[in-house]
């Protein structure tokens, strides 16, 4: 678990997220690089890093996915926000398969807001290690703990299958 990832670590997080989504059947995952704003602002390092990651992914792909960012949360989920802001993104309004937060604090806050306000059911795992590791909140219920274990089992089976087929 990386609290404030650098660029190399962010690439690994993106690759691990894309791989996890592929294990669940997503052919070409669309990942949003979450930021406070959708415009590159040199005073906001995460916007600069998001732009750089998208550029590097286009030039020398480091993950099997589509990458978009920086993008604000409202634009990730709302077509109306994209229309009002005149923001042209083919996946705005719910078309993204995953959201990459700029740091652990942002990710934790986002997931906890889903749990409390949207009554979401979540699962948690550390991916990118030798084997997936189930990771839940201290307040996770039995269902979330179970789903975290199922997630890890599916991901591990997919990784073993890829390895047997000679894929990375």
Give short role names for the model-derived ranges.
Residues 1-93, 97-101, 106-168:
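Anion-binding alpha/beta catalytic cores of soluble intermediary-metabolism enzymes, centered on
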């Amino acid at each position: 678990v990386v609290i404030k990832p650098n660029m190399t670590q962010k690439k690994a997080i993106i690759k691990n997220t894309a791989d996890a989504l592929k294990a669940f059947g997503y052919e070409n995952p669309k990942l949003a690089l979450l930021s406070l704003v959708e415009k590159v602002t040199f005073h906001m390092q995460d916007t600069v890093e998001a732009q750089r990651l998208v550029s590097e992914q286009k030039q020398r792909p480091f993950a099997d996915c589509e990458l978009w960012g920086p993008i604000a949360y409202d634009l990730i989920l709302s077509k109306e926000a994209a229309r009002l802001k005149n923001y042209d993104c083919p996946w705005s309004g719910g078309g993204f398969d995953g959201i990459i937060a700029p740091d652990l604090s942002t990710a934790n806050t986002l997931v906890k807001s889903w749990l409390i306000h949207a009554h979401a059911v979540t699962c948690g795992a550390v991916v990118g290690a030798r084997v997936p590791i189930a990771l839940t909140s201290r307040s996770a219920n039995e269902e979330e703990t179970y789903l975290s274990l199922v997630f890890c089992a599916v991901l591990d089976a997919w990784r073993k299958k890829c390895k047997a087929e000679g894929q990375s």
